[in-house]
Swiss-Prot record:
It comes from Botryotinia fuckeliana (strain B05.10) (Noble rot fungus). One of its GO terms (cellular component) is extracellular region. This is Class II hydrophobin 2. Disulfide bonds join C34-C80, C41-C71, C42-C54, C81-C92. InterPro entries: Cerato-ulmin_hydrophobin, Hydrophobin_sf. PANTHER family: HYDROPHOBIN. Its main location: secreted. The gene is Bhp2. It comes from the Eukaryota. It holds the Pfam family Hydrophobin_2. Residues 1-21 form the signal peptide. Aerial growth, conidiation, and dispersal of filamentous fungi in the environment rely upon a capability of their secreting small amphipathic proteins called hydrophobins (HPBs) with low sequence identity. Class I can self-assemble into an outermost layer of rodlet bundles on aerial cell surfaces, conferring cellular hydrophobicity that supports fungal growth, development and dispersal; whereas Class II form highly ordered films at water-air interfaces through intermolecular interactions but contribute nothing to the rodlet structure.
Amino acid sequence: MFFSRISTIVSMTALFASALAMPTTLTSRQDAICSSGNPQCCDVDVLGVADLDCEAPPAAYTDIKSFSDVCADVGKINMCCDLPVLGQGLICSSPDNS
């Protein structure tokens, strides 16, 4: 009985020590850039009402700058559109309010 308690204590200590010794890794995630809309890469913005030739960003982004860079890489501007319909964005705004 004494041996089983020592064995349990040693096992638990080893378990906790190995859990503490493992490094944590963080992965970047997308921020909520478009709080009330869908992120889109669009060709032309028409007075914030309609945007033409929109598509979902072709690559991952983590913040507004990287979202802008992803869209610029395909020759488009970054927009947040409330209603993306058939390649057109309706009621769109810039994610950085510029």
